[in-house]
Amino acid sequence: MAFDQTLTTQAKLVALQALATGTLKMALYTADADLGAGTLVYSTANEVVGTGYTAGGNVLTSVTVLTSGTTAYLDFDNVVWNPANFTARGALIYNTNLGNLAVAVLDFGSDKTTTTTFTVQTPANTADAALIRFA
């Protein structure tokens, strides 16, 4: 008999489903924002301001929690602002049904500026590439 000390795949799935229950939103932020692992909740501090952007960001659509092997991961559609005229450095994904609980911080690597359409393109829908995953 062998033991493999681990968080079970089912526990990962249930935890991620709990985070994804309700409404998930993506808010965009300027380079002046201070977001990271210690971020607790959504804040308007240093949130993007500009044409086509509304405080609080956009609702994530087609949210699905999946598993592959021992990884649970979250998939959702690309997030689009159209029209758009603003600059963003990163984003916060948060859950409005859990007191605006911060779920994930995304760093775009540099300022991204648009005067037409702004799209946050999600990676492949796989356990190895998803933006939010419990491995």
Identify what each model region corresponds to.
Residues 1-89, 96-135:
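Small cysteine-rich, disulfide-bonded extracellular modules of the LU/uPAR three-finger superfamily
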